[in-house]
Amino acid sequence: MWVCLQLPVFLASVTLFEVAASDTIAQAASTTTISDAVSKVKIQVNKAFLDSRTRLKTTLSSEAPTTQQLSEYFKHAKGRTRTAIRNGQVWEESLKRLRRDTTLTNVTDPSLDLTALSWEVGCGAPVPLVKCDENSPYRTITGDCNNRRSPALGAANRALARWLPAEYEDGLALPFGWTQRKTRNGFRVPLAREVSNKIVGYLDEEGVLDQNRSLLFMQWGQIVDHDLDFAPETELGSNEHSKTQCEEYCIQGDNCFPIMFPKNDPKLKTQGKCMPFFRAGFVCPTPPYQSLAREQINAVTSFLDASLVYGSEPSLASRLRNLSSPLGLMAVNQEAWDHGLAYLPFNNKKPSPCEFINTTARVPCFLAGDFRASEQILLATAHTLLLREHNRLARELKKLNPHWNGEKLYQEARKILGAFIQIITFRDYLPIVLGSEMQKWIPPYQGYNNSVDPRISNVFTFAFRFGHMEVPSTVSRLDENYQPWGPEAELPLHTLFFNTWRIIKDGGIDPLVRGLLAKKSKLMNQDKMVTSELRNKLFQPTHKIHGFDLAAINLQRCRDHGMPGYNSWRGFCGLSQPKTLKGLQTVLKNKILAKKLMDLYKTPDNIDIWIGGNAEPMVERGRVGPLLACLLGRQFQQIRDGDRFWWENPGVFTEKQRDSLQKVSFSRLICDNTHITKVPLHAFQANNYPHDFVDCSTVDKLDLSPWASREN
């Protein structure tokens, strides 16, 4: 059984500003040398960041953006995140320059004053020192101040946590597969696309649906994931390797790590030699600099706090609010309405990739607390429901408490919606993900523990991608009788990326919500892993552009992040570590799959965690195997126990409020925020209409009377 990590060393040093004075005697790189190197690098990196922003605006205005450029719109770092990533880039490039231009033999040479370098780069700049109000009953938007001993713990724009040390080809930053002749554990790593082609792909969509899980089960997983983590791509740091060279000519270098197509790949005929791939944004190392290996950023808060609704940066949080109203409302769309109900506001910053999808309709992307909200139509639908629920709560609270001002109403509604997401996730979602392993990894709540590290781990960002196996090839829209809606009731998934016009001008969200309730998720199958809609047509909303391969991207991203291999994580979780084909067959209970993996990777040690974890047979009553159950369960337990504002923690809500909150349900959310009147009681389970559906009048409502107060 895993025991909570104690953090005395980490808590003493996690904040970017708590830098220890250097005790070096001889400094090969003097302060002047460091300053000169950093100044030169800043000019180079700043230009690269500016060029990238300019290029993105130009290409999206061209009426013919590429798949990469559409993707980049959502992966583009903004605000404080952009500053943090830029500083990380300057740090790394400065180290390279100092190593090249001075007598240093390696970048961890004790004679290099890393403290001086940190300050010269400006590594403290992205996150100004926060003055915490210890008596505030509300979370900060940034996630700071949750842990009183270490206020930055779990905050946005910090490094993802490492549960095992990073494994890079050069020990610092280069991913395995970067240098052709270099090996990992004695073997060359296979091309990511080759693994996707031989292991992940399938042709026949028959029999792939999950007879026990609704499509909403898949969609809730993406909502939770976007609440917890986001690692935007970085920019290219040198002038030698422009994005054009990476995207059009597959020239590897700097932060360009193209996904090369293997021989006989059908994409060779239409897409050239590769899919472009840009490495994830990373941050400066933190004192005491025990490791200088590249650490990827988490741009959002690590807490399950509805940050995807409210944002993780103060400037965005403010932009999302209706500050002209004293009701504590979120801003809504002023140009279009869903039969009297609100839509998300448009992100009116031009250009918008969503307008390119249908140049006649010209509907922009939506604006939400997470920039990925318009990535696909069901995600935008779920965001819309959460936005409406905030405003419903705020209005109801105003009726109960006419004396509350807009700020109080906003914060209380935000607090309740955060609790809603926590309850739905832990009560309804995780038990049918982890199945028989639920109690092992997430025992009953014992209260807040300030020694538990709530940060999202790097490996979790891959473990949680099991949801990609649950995405079906089509999305259905249903009418009030749960029958096909209109002439285009069933749409291919790839036509719904960046597709906001289908919501605004073609039926609203109700037909899509009914599809989420009455249609099924895809079932992960060892020989039918990821639909071709994601494996060949990702971000291909029109026939004018080519699609990406999400599976290959996941595998390449494992290497980009320096992920240890399959057996390292099996050992971490106390599971057996197969060394041979026979051993792998025993673990996977599948001789054919084990042989395919061994033919590609040569050793189980090298299998990328994303494919290795997903290849395992599912645990009883769950939808992941033993390894992913361990990684997911451990992470969610830490998210819960390391959160001072967790809804069950005494003092966060009153006892009566907690009793009331236990009655929330996703079905009630739908009843309260759509025109739908028939819903299933168990929204994540597969449901057949009308047998499994009830009238909204029979679904418990959230009783807000415990929130009535005489206090302001």
Curated annotation (Swiss-Prot):
Effect of mutating residue 375 to Q: Decrease in activity
Entries under SUPFAM superfamilies matching the protein: Heme-dependent peroxidases (SSF48113)
EC code: 1.11.1.7
InterPro entries, sorted: Haem_peroxidase_animal, Haem_peroxidase_sf, Haem_peroxidase_sf_animal
Effect of residue 225 to V: Partially bound heme
GO biological process: antibacterial humoral response; defense response to bacterium; detection of chemical stimulus involved in sensory perception of bitter taste; hydrogen peroxide catabolic process; response to oxidative stress
Function as written in the Swiss-Prot or TrEMBL entry: Heme-containing oxidoreductase which catalyzes the conversion of thiocyanate (SCN(-)) into antimicrobial agent hypothiocyanous acid (OSCN(-)) in the presence of hydrogen peroxide (H2O2). Also involved in the conversion of iodide (I(-)) into hypoiodite (IO(-)) in the presence of H2O2. Responsible for the inactivation of a wide range of micro-organisms and hence, important component of defense mechanism. The lactoperoxidase-SCN(-)-H2O2 system shows antibacterial properties against some streptococci strains. The lactoperoxidase-I(-)-H2O2 system shows antibacterial properties against E.coli.
Family: Belongs to the peroxidase family. XPO subfamily.
Name of protein: Lactoperoxidase
Species of the source: Bos taurus
Taxonomic path: Eukaryota, Metazoa, Chordata, Craniata, Vertebrata
